[in-house]
Structure formats: C-alpha cells, structure tokens
C-alpha cells in the first residue's frame, strides 16, 4: 500500500466534503465502491486505487472529523495575517491533513508529513501555496 497515494485520496475527500458539504461517511463509502468497480470516476483517475490503504484513509478522515476544532485551532494559531476562512479549500484540506498527522500519527516523521503536504500543494494548488503551507506547518514542528 502506498501512503503517498493514500494521503492524496484523503486530501481529495476532505476537499470534496469541505466544498460541497457531503457527509464524510458517504464519501468514504463512495470511495470504497469506486475502488471495487472496474470503471474509475473522474475524481480518482490519476490515482490507482488498488495502491490505496483504505484503512489509513478512513483513520485520517475520521480523526480529522473527530478533532476538527483542535486541528483548526492549531492552524489558526499559526496563520500570520490570514484568517482560516480566507484559505482556499484545497489549502485548508492539505493543512488539516498534515496537522492531523503531526499531532496524532506518531509513527510518521514530522518532516515526512510536511514534505508530503508541500508536494500535494504543488500538485493541486501551486507554488505560492506550497510556500505558504510550508511556512504554516514549519511553525508547528
């Protein structure tokens, strides 16, 4: 199983639910259905779902949902001249994912989590966002 791909899927699910208010349980169930079907939905075309650790994705998503206030508080405390409400939904999803890993996933080296977040930002948000996310997360470690 590939942690990088699993993180990417988790970030996409977070983004999806943040953007359209979809229930996380429904999003996870949809992911499971897509993974088991032969035809891939557009949302997941660039990720081979066979390599995704669904249990890890579920743990991350449920952990973020359970600790959302604490995670958002940590993010807010490390934003300089920004409000969390002004962040793009992609950047917020990446920050929530990495903040959760930094705080609750002790088996993952902090630098690995931050580097993965930066790579997600480069892929889904852009170079400026990657620099911004690096700065915010750098204050947390």
From Swiss-Prot:
GO terms for molecular function: RNA binding. Disulfide bonds: none annotated. GO terms for biological process: DNA-templated transcription termination; transcription antitermination. GO terms for cellular component: cytosol. It comes from the Bacteria. SUPFAM superfamilies: NusB-like (SSF48013). InterPro entries: NusB-like_sf (IPR035926), NusB_fam (IPR011605), NusB_RsmB_TIM44 (IPR006027). Keywords: RNA-binding, Transcription, Transcription antitermination, Transcription regulation. The keyword Zinc does not apply. Belongs to the NusB family. Involved in transcription antitermination. Required for transcription of ribosomal RNA (rRNA) genes. Binds specifically to the boxA antiterminator sequence of the ribosomal RNA (rrn) operons. This is Transcription antitermination protein NusB.
């Amino acid at each position: 199983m590939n942690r990088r791909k699993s993180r990417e899927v988790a970030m996409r699910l977070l983004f999806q639910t943040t953007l359209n208010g979809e229930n996380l349980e429904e999003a996870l169930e949809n992911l499971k259905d897509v993974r088991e079907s032969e035809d891939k939905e557009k949302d997941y075309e660039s990720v081979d779902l066979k390599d995704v650790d669904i249990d890890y994705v579920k743990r991350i998503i449920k952990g973020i949902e359970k600790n959302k206030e604490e995670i958002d508080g940590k993010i807010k405390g490390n934003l300089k001249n920004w409000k969390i409400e002004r962040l793009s939904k992609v950047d917020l999803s990446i920050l929530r994912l990495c903040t959760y890993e930094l705080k609750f996933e002790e088996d993952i080296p902090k630098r690995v989590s931050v580097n993965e977040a930066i790579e997600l930002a480069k892929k889904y948000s852009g170079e400026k966002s990657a620099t911004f996310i690096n700065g915010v997360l750098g204050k947390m470690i």
